Amino acid sequence: MSYSSFSIAQGSRVPSLSGTRSSSSYSLKSDLIPQSRRSHSVYGTPGSIRISSPSMPSAIVSSYSSTLSSALPSSSYGGNSYSSSTSFSSGGTDFLLGTSGKEAMQNLNDRLADYLARVRSLEDRNRELEQKIREWYEKQGAGTKRKDFSHYFKIIADLQNQINAGNMENARILLKIDNAKLAADDFKQKWEAEQALRLGVEADIHGLRKILDEMTLARTDLEMQIEGHKEEKAYLIKSHDEDMKALRSQLGGQVNVEVDAAPAEDLTKKLEIIRQRYEQLAEKNRKESEDWFIKKSEELNKNMASSTEALQTSKTEINELRRTIQGLEIELQSQQSMKGALEGQLADTEHRYSSTLMNLQNIINQKEAELSNIRADIESQASKYKILLDVKTRLENEISTYRTLLEGDAGRSHSSSHLSSTVSKDKVPVSSPNVITKVRTIVEEKINGQVISKKEYEGSPDQLSYY
């Protein structure tokens, strides 16, 4: 009768442990194993760890190569990769460790020592990198202080206040310019109104001048008529005197002959009456002409005086408006030149401070990129260090598992069958507190290679029993 196949499972994986036994079923517990056989020691230095045991069943190390590689996970850190696999084989049916078993144990210890030495070297390298990072931070202390841009914020705030003040000053200047433009437009409208009034007055003066010319012509005509009447009067007087003389001479040389006839009219009286009438008519015409001329002259003088005063007032106002417009134009030109200078100064200031801000932003981006790279390196180092810690913890768990297996299988010293085992352990994170380790034992009875019976048992590693 032979036993075949028992398995130890942790988590969800169930590796198999197979072997043959010639004795009947029995229960192997840790309390039944003598202290001498269960004694073992784990000792180590910072560079190595050794596991020693006075005896170790060959069933544990027969097929260890296929499962230890999964129990000891491969890891890479800092460009170095490590993988662990160990194989043990038993010579014959001896359950005690022979020469090959000791060599396998030594090989395992050497591999474990090498692995832990690599872990220690990586830890040393990690410490060196951390020291270099701290030294770099100490060297870059001034650079890290430059990352405090609070004083730049104050300068930027002052510059923004200056820019705002310049904008307000520009707004006030623009408002003054607009007010000056409105005042200039108002004065221009007044000037246009006065210009229209002036043109109207000049047109009236031109019309009055035409009237004056007409009156002058009429006066000249009347004077000429008066002169003609005077000449006619003188001619009439002269002709009258001549007629009188002729009549007197005729009367003196004739004989008076009285004839009973109607009395003759007195021509002198008639001529005198005619002369008086002409004189009265001429005097009347002269007085009427003089009165009309005086009246028209007074009206014309009054109109000319009022027009002259209005024209003088208009000229004065025009001169004042012209001077005001010239002053406003000069002020407008000065304000425009000041505006151009302020705009150029503002553009220069904005360009200069935009360049400064761009340089500061580039420095900030560079420092942030350096900080991101350093943070990424630190996170990478931390993650790799965490992986190493996990590997170390798993390795310690593996050592604990080896210790348990050494304690559990130390009593199997009288079996002559060949037993091969495969131990596998899942990569369960150490930080998972809810993982329960269970052991399932499968016992098969075979006769001539045929399975007669098969039994399965489950329990924790401390409760493992063999039947």
Swiss-Prot record:
SUPFAM superfamilies: Intermediate filament protein, coiled coil region
The keyword Nuclease belongs to this UniProt entry's keyword annotation: no
Region of interest: Linker 12: 249-268
Keyword NAD assigned: no
Region (Linker 1): 138-156
GO molecular function, one term: structural molecule activity
Keyword vocabulary terms for this entry: Coiled coil, Intermediate filament, Keratin
Disordered: annotated segments: 12-32, 409-430
Record-annotated IF rod domain positions: 101-413
Annotated segments matching region Coil 1A: 101-137
Region of interest (Coil 2), ranges: 269-416
Classification via InterPro entries: IF_conserved (IPR018039), IF_rod_dom (IPR039008), Keratin_I (IPR002957)
Additional record remark: There are two types of cytoskeletal and microfibrillar keratin, I (acidic) and II (neutral to basic) (40-55 and 56-70 kDa, respectively).
Protein name: Keratin, type 1 cytoskeletal 11
Organism: Protopterus aethiopicus (Marbled lungfish)
Lineage: Eukaryota, Metazoa, Chordata, Craniata, Vertebrata
